[in-house]
Amino acid sequence: MNAVAEAPATEDVPAPFVFTDSAADKVKQLIEEEGNAELKLRVFVQGGGCSGFQYGFTFDEDVNEDDTTMVKNGVTLLIDSMSYQYLVGAEIDYKEDINGAQFVIKNPNASTTCGCGSSFSV
């Protein structure tokens, strides 16, 4: 397991990804609603969607050996080693606007994205 601290990034060593306060707070709320403090948010990339890859979000109680973890505001984010390579430098956020509310990934590695925002290619 690889852990990513909540330390600020330096110019020489950028953080591998950003888990915003807004996203962490929403996940914390959802975990409280589930009533299981052992839940962690797993973010992953899988084949599919109209652009070749798509993002997925699920709750998981287990941390796998190849997972990278990040703790923010008491919430643990998990990313497996295969997905990690596609998410390096990405920002995982939660947005609420007139169109609704959703988790959003801003990924600098994506060369194209689908209109739905959940599918991308590299």
From Swiss-Prot:
Gene3D superfamilies: HesB-like domain. Required for insertion of 4Fe-4S clusters. The keyword Iron-sulfur applies. Keywords: Iron, Iron-sulfur, Metal-binding. It holds the Pfam family Fe-S_biosyn. NCBIfam families: iron-sulfur cluster assembly accessory protein (TIGR00049), PRK13623.1 (NF010147). This is Putative iron-sulfur cluster insertion protein ErpA. GO terms for molecular function: 2 iron, 2 sulfur cluster binding; 4 iron, 4 sulfur cluster binding; iron ion binding. Iron-sulfur cluster binds at C50, C114, C116. Disulfide bonds: none annotated. Binds 1 iron-sulfur cluster per subunit. Belongs to the HesB/IscA family. The lineage of its organism: Bacteria, Pseudomonadati, Pseudomonadota, Betaproteobacteria, Burkholderiales. The gene is erpA. Homodimer. Its cofactor is iron-sulfur cluster. InterPro entries: FeS_biogenesis (IPR000361), FeS_cluster_insertion (IPR016092), FeS_cluster_insertion_CS (IPR017870), FeS_cluster_insertion_RrpA (IPR023063), HesB-like_dom_sf (IPR035903). GO terms for biological process: iron-sulfur cluster assembly.
